[in-house]
């Protein structure tokens, strides 16, 4: 006989079914008093690292700061209470941190794949949720919107019955409870829910790729060869042309992916299929935002000799030649400024930078060039 229990991993649907006049429950998920209980703070991660360093379980040349720098973009940035945002440190996912540390301590090196395979069960849940009934189109739009913008505005719902699971607010709330979204601020009386980190972002892109490949199959061998040529030889044209051709050929979902923002989502999903690079969309350089920075993953692949910044420009199908010429000129000026940025230069790790401008009109690539010469 239990007088009091604490239950973890409870969804809003389960909570709705459990609570009644006979079962009194308190949902502490978004209670700011418990925000830091649901993960590791950076200080706690550093304590863990120092413990293993002092025990001699981590190599001397692997520093505390280098480990934090490695895992922060992949496992950090969770916030579970609106009142805690901006006031308390963001939280690391404890499972993901332990996955990394298990490799580092047990095998002597960081995992080659930074995506924690344990979190991929959430991806399976995501697919099942989307296809649960005949109204999946609206939920697909939500997933696309989140993947392409990196956030969505909504109100979180603490509990609801199963029959209302697929309503907009409830569906978005489920994504939050499954760890696919976290609190990133407020907009009026709504929350700005964001993709917390690269580990989760890749799960969204994997869903998009599954959807795209159901329409237009992905030749993995050809794509691998194209990434090899781009990373090792600096021959980027096969890679960019492959992705642009796939964008053109995916005719059945043209209405869904038309537009510059959706083009970026499509490009991002394909670029994440390599481990040679860490893909950084919308990174700030010289007070502007570069569409893509292909940051060499030098810690794992020191043989990579070439890095890339991409500027995507989209024109509607009825745009004039004058529109295209003006847009191209602006893109060239933009990417030259980005390429000269000191912060960007410091991140190249000795690789040769290739600034690439891609101009799409409708569904067709009309101009693809490297600015400043090269292949």
Residue map of PLM features:
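Glycine-rich, histidine-containing beta strand-loop boundary motifs that form or position
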Residues: 6-10, 17, 185-187
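Domain-level recognition of nuclease-like catalytic cores that cleave nucleotide substrates
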Residues: 343-375
């Amino acid at each position: 006989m239990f007088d009091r229990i604490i239950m973890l991993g409870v969804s809003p649907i389960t909570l709705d079914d459990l609570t009644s006049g006979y079962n009194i429950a308190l949902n502490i998920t978004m209670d700011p008093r418990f925000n830091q209980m649901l993960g590791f703070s950076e200080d706690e991660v550093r304590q863990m690292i120092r413990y293993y360093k002092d025990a001699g379980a981590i190599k001397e040349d692997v520093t505390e700061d280098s480990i934090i720098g490695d895992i922060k973009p992949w496992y950090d940035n969770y916030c579970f209470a609106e009142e805690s945002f901006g006031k308390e440190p963001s939280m690391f996912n404890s499972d993901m941190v332990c996955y990394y540390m298990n490799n580092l301590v047990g095998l002597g090196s960081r995992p080659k794949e930074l995506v924690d395979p344990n979190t991929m069960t959430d991806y399976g849940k995501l697919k099942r949720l989307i296809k649960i009934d005949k109204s999946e189109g609206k939920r697909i739009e939500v997933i696309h919107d989140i993947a392409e913008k990196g956030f969505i505005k909504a109100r979180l719902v603490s509990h609801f019955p199963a029959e209302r699971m697929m309503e907009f607010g409830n569906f978005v709330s489920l994504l939050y409870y499954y760890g696919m979204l976290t609190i990133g601020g407020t907009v009026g009386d709504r929350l700005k829910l964001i993709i917390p980190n690269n580990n989760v972002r890749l799960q969204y892109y994997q869903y998009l790729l599954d959807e795209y490949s159901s329409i237009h199959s992905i030749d993995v061998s050809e794509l691998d060869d194209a990434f090899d040529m781009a990373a090792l030889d600096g021959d980027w044209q096969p890679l960019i042309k492959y992705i642009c051709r796939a964008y053109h050929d995916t005719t059945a979902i043209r209405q869904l992916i038309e537009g510059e923002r959706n083009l970026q989502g499509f490009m991002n999903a394909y670029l994440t299929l390599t481990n040679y690079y860490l893909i950084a969309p919308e990174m700030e350089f010289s007070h502007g935002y570069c569409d893509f920075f292909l940051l060499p993953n030098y810690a794992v692949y020191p043989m990579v000799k070439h890095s890339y910044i991409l500027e995507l420009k989209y024109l509607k199908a009825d745009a004039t030649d004058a529109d295209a010429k003006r847009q191209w000129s602006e893109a060239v000026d933009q990417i030259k400024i980005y390429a000269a940025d000191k912060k960007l230069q410091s991140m190249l790790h000795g690789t040769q930078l290739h600034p690439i401008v891609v101009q799409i009109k409708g569904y067709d690539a009309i101009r693809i060039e490297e600015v400043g010469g090269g292949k």
